[in-house]
Amino acid sequence: MLFRYLVWLFRFIKVKNVASISLLVIGSNYLTTAIANNTSISPTTSSNHITTAIPNNTSILPTTSSNHITTAISNNITDKDDYTHFSTDKTISDSLTPITLYRAIRSTLNDTGTKTMTDHGLTRPYRPTTVIFHSDTSLPVKNATRDNSIKKIYRQVISFFIQSNPLFPCFKNHEVFLNLANILNTILCIILIKNV
């Protein structure tokens, strides 16, 4: 049912250019589903669904759901490895950390070719994280992410998911980070290009 809705949504969205970008986050008050290694996604949602949009001014407006508030993301995004809010679970791999996946995804911003997670020392292939549609075609525009403004916003999107977020507590788990690229492309996030 959700897939049909997304197809309908894309059919009725008029895309004019790739100058601005917004992220539509379809989630719930608490998303407690663990994403399995087979990349199947079956979210268990609560009664209160929320929709959070990231506007093209590169900031995330506060969204209140019950007693939980998501605040704006800072522009400071660093590569340091000491993210204390990440899980220290070692069941996946000692060499696999959320920041490693973050770097792998971020490296796709400067790459117009097709990459896999194994190219970055990770364990499974993934589709291109950034899905951008041109005005006259439904195919992804591979070089659209080379625009600096899109890079800046997209990096903030990644920061939104890798930081400790009470709205999506399951993202603290390494197993979920293994499928972050698929999540961004399917259930939780839809990247839309709209007018400036």
From Swiss-Prot:
<comment type="similarity">
    <text>Belongs to the asfivirus I196L family.</text>
</comment>
<feature type="repeat" description="1">
    <location>
        <begin position="28"/>
        <end position="48"/>
    </location>
</feature>
<keyword id="KW-0677">Repeat</keyword>
<keyword id="KW-0426">Late protein</keyword>
<feature type="repeat" description="2">
    <location>
        <begin position="49"/>
        <end position="68"/>
    </location>
</feature>
<feature type="repeat" description="3; approximate">
    <location>
        <begin position="69"/>
        <end position="87"/>
    </location>
</feature>
<protein>
    <recommendedName>
        <fullName>Late protein I196L</fullName>
    </recommendedName>
</protein>
